[in-house]
């Protein structure tokens, strides 16, 4: 049989309309007895299709309704197919291994142990030692007896750094703790070092050439010479170019009074050949003294002690060294 195109379109439109579609679904469900998977049925918009979706439930319900009058126990079994199983206990009674409370308690316990460990570490011996000096009392000063000081000084003369055995033996001898003996030796060494420094500085001051150089006493016979000639050799000579050396009043030659009166400063009066050469020509502005000649005796007539002689010897050596340094300058 051949259908026209208009007839087929009408059939399609009638089949695709919502009302005809539901009727066809109902008829198909009654004939075939299968479930209908339409959008309205799945979403629950059409309540009439519940019987189509669960045809077995309706049959069970009718069957149970028919047998409910005779056997109520079987009704409960059919309505509740799992009723013969023992009911589950409350979830709070079952021990769950993934309970949040158990994890929180366990974490709290671990954190508590960690805090205790940190606190125990913080209370280490270092912190205890830091708090201990606050409670420590000041040690009293040890008063040594004469016998103890005598024995300690004798031991210090033998050795400035005694070993522990020597200190223990000495402590037993003087009836003192070994720690006190050790501290005494430390203080005694410090005192000894200070004394050594003081002595060394004193010796340096005594050995200094400027302090050891003392000007010897002048003889009365050369008294007028103080006003005419300078005593220091490095000062310029007051002699003028026109004044002869022998025309100065109070001037004495090298053979008159300097041999016995003033032996230390012979360079103030030049030798005779030098004086004669100075007469015709003018002296330079800075005259160089002649070399020191050791032809005058060192001993003085009124020499009091050997210390004065030693001082004069040092002065003589100092002047000679100064002359040697001035000679290249000339």
Swiss-Prot record:
It is found in: Nucleus. Pfam families: Homeodomain (PF00046), OAR (PF03826). A motif (Nuclear localization signal) lies at residues 312-316. Its main location: nucleus. SUPFAM superfamilies: Homeodomain-like. Coiled coil: none annotated. The keyword Ribonucleoprotein does not apply. Keywords: Developmental protein, DNA-binding, Homeobox, Nucleus, Transcription, Transcription regulation. Residues 90-104 have a biased composition (Basic and acidic residues). A motif (Octapeptide motif) lies at residues 37-44. Belongs to the paired homeobox family. Bicoid subfamily. This is Retinal homeobox protein Rx1. It comes from Danio rerio (Zebrafish).
